Amino acid sequence: MDSDSTVTSLEENTENFCTNPTRDILAEGITNLFKPTIERLDERVASTIQLQAELRGQLDALAAQLRDIEKAQSQIPEFADKVKELLNVKHKVTVISNVLVTSQERLTGLHKLIEKEQRRRQALLDSALSTNIS
């Protein structure tokens, strides 16, 4: 092994890490760039979770009412099958709701990226036109 190693000590790396203003500014800029999007996404996820919990509660209440009706009218044998179908529908509604929410969030993000790209291209075009006119 070479005794003249170029590897720096942990203390030197820690010093460089702590006193790098360019890195700090860049990190702060990146954080500020993503923070609003992450906050909106977090709010939407929380809202969706709450709405799904409410829907699940309503479907559970309906299923309980149907079970009570089934007990009261036990002479209708196909009614139990309808309760099972309702529970299957409840599961499907939950899955579809999750897919739709995810798709909507992705489409919203894509739409924002498209608008941003259009503004950037328009600014470049305006800049090029003003340079050519001058």
From Swiss-Prot:
Entry's localization field: Membrane; Cytoplasm, Cytosol
Keywords: Coiled coil, Cytoplasm, Membrane
Coiled coil region boundaries: 50-124
GO MF terms held by the record: SNARE binding
Chief localisation class: membrane
Pfam family, one: Snapin_Pallidin
One GO BP annotation of this record: synaptic vesicle transport
Any one GO cellular component localisation term in the record: secretory granule
Keyword Metal-binding: no
Recorded topology in the membrane: Peripheral membrane protein
Domain of life: Eukaryota
Subunit structure: Component of the biogenesis of lysosome-related organelles complex-1 (BLOC-1) composed of Blos1, Blos2, Blos3, Blos4, Dysb, Muted, Pldn and Snapin. Interacts with Blos2 and Dysb.
Family: Belongs to the SNAPIN family.
Role description: Component of the biogenesis of lysosome-related organelles complex-1 (BLOC-1) involved in pigment granule biogenesis. May participate in the coupling of lysosomes to microtubule plus-end-directed kinesin motor.
Protein's name according to its UniProt entry: SNAPIN protein homolog
